[in-house]
A protein has these predicted regions:
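N-terminal Rossmann NAD(P)H-binding glycine-rich loop of SDR-like oxidoreductase domains
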Residues: 33-51
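Rossmann-fold cofactor-recognition segment
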Residues: 80-95
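Glycine-/Pro-rich loop/turn segments that contact NAD(P) or position catalytic residues
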Residues: 116-225, 261, 268
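Conserved glycine-rich Rossmann-like NAD(P)H-binding loop of the short-chain dehydrogenase/reductase
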Residues: 55-69
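Structural motif
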Residues: 32, 108-109, 134, 350
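Conserved Rossmann-fold cofactor-binding substructure of NAD(P)-dependent oxidoreductases
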Residues: 91-106, 113-116
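Short, low-complexity intrinsically disordered segments enriched in A/P/G/S/L with frequent Arg
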Residues: 3-5, 9-10, 15, 24, ...
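C-terminal catalytic/substrate-binding lobe primarily of soluble NAD(P)-dependent oxidoreductases
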Residues: 23-25, 183-413
Length: 413
């Protein structure tokens, strides 16, 4: 097996070892990708996706706290693909900084699904920046991403690293969907784009816990999600649409503004990429085709947000779904998503769409796995932007092409 040598506390003959720090270039490290959190619901789906898509064609590993649970996942991977007997198993704990340093130093790209990221993400980012390792995650937490930019962008940029958050349904379909749309438009003209989301799927315990924790500090989350107002070179303008809830006759649907991290990510990409034009505006909406569903969703979200403000009711909500649980394979198989973009410049109007299967887990695991593979294998095709970057800035068209080959559709309507 392609495992790391035992560190302190490791026993000869074990498949699970503690990672040892290495000073060699990342391509000479034991692994090209490590999946941290592989025993969780989404992390396991990521590992299973890699087992099916790459097998042992490149060296990769799974990592987490529990040796026993990691061994269980490893056996499942071997059952999917016997080549995965070569997949490494590494013990690491987000609460143990030395173990994270050893883990980050063992791989070219560290993929983490361990959330909530506001609680567990920053130590992993720190280890990656200090050890010279690229990083991807699936967070949708604005405060965490903003803090990552503030604390580590310059250090990561100085080392030529790509620290890329939001590599799942938050926010790849939106961020790369807008990039794909912009590339269909003439250069040098003002651009206005609306993104309209529809989806069907389930909820995992990890996502539920992250959402409740975000609702508990809603003011900070909303503040972190506001786009930057710093002036851009050359007088470029990047702005959020001010359109509120409205009925769209062309789509026969209500368009409800979505206060998620996605528009913040899109606008950050627009600020960093001149190709988005001299004056860029973006609006982000949920597309709801039933008034009853719209009202029911609004009441439900408001109720959960209110209950999240108080410790007793917050703990009750957290107990509804345990971490590590999630929708069944049958539910995931029936899920789907579409994000439709309506774009206009002075000389052209188009509609595009990104679509795929169940968004929260089936496609999220695919998206983040392909993001890690893109960083590990496509470096000669990546945009020049480094630091704490978005998927559009850090991977761009190379990742769009990977996702298309993996079955996620990007198309002009």
């Amino acid at each position: 097996m392609n495992n790391l040598p035992p560190g302190d506390g490791g026993r000869p003959g074990e498949r699970c070892y503690r990672a040892r720090a290495m000073e060699s270039p990342t391509q000479d490290r034991p692994y090209r990708i490590v999946v941290l959190g592989a025993t969780g619901f989404t992390g396991r789906l990521v590992a299973e996706y890699l087992a099916r898509s790459v097998g042992a064609s490149l060296p990769w590993a799974i990592a987490g706290r529990s040796v026993a649970k990691l061994e269980e996942v490893h056996r499942a991977l071997v059952a999917i693909n016997p080549e995965c007997s070569k997949v490494g198993v590494v013990q690491a704990d987000v609460g143990d900084a030395p173990s994270l340093d050893r883990l980050a130093a063992s791989t070219s790209v560290l993929l983490t699904t361990v959330g909530p990221y506001a609680r567990h993400g920053m130590p992993v980012v720190r280890a990656c920046v200090e050890q010279g390792t690229d990083y991807v995650d699936i967070t949708g937490e604005p405060a965490f991403v903003k803090e990552t930019v503030e604390r580590y962008h310059e250090a990561a940029k100085a080392k030529g690293l790509r620290i890329v958050s939001c590599c799942g349904f938050d926010s790849i379909p939106h961020d790369l969907g807008v990039l794909y749309t912009v590339l269909q438009l003439p250069e040098g003209e003002p651009v206005s784009i609306e993104g309209m989301v529809r989806a069907k799927g389930g909820v995992s315990g990890g996502t539920w816990h992250s959402a409740i924790n975000a609702f508990s500090d809603l003011r900070s989350a909303m503040s972190a999600g506001r786009p930057s107002k710093e002036p851009l070179p050359g007088g470029r303008k990047v702005r959020a649409s001010k359109a509120g809830l409205h009925f769209d006759k062309a789509r026969s649907a209500w368009l409800c503004p979505l206060p998620t991290i996605d528009p913040w990510i899109v606008l950050r990409s627009a600020r960093g990429l001149d190709r988005y034009g001299p004056d860029f505006r973006y609006g982000h909406f949920a597309e709801v085709r039933s008034t009853a569903v719209l009202l029911g969703g609004a009441v439900g979200i408001a109720g959960v947000a209110a209950l999240s403000q108080f410790k007793p009711t917050r703990e009750w909500l957290l107990g509804r779904i345990a971490p590590g649980e999630g929708p069944s394979e049958e539910v995931r198989a029936k899920g789907w998503f579409t994000v439709t973009f309506r774009a206009s410049t002075r000389s052209k109007t188009i509609e595009t769409q990104v679509s795929g299967g169940e968004a929260g887990y089936a496609e999220t695991s695919k998206m983040v796995a392909e993001s890690a593979l893109c960083l590990a294998l496509d470096r000669d095709r990546l945009p020049p932007h480094t630091g704490v970057v978005t998927t559009a800035m850090g991977m761009g068209e190379a990742l769009i092409e990977r996702l298309q080959r993996a079955g996620i559709a990007f198309r002009v309507l």
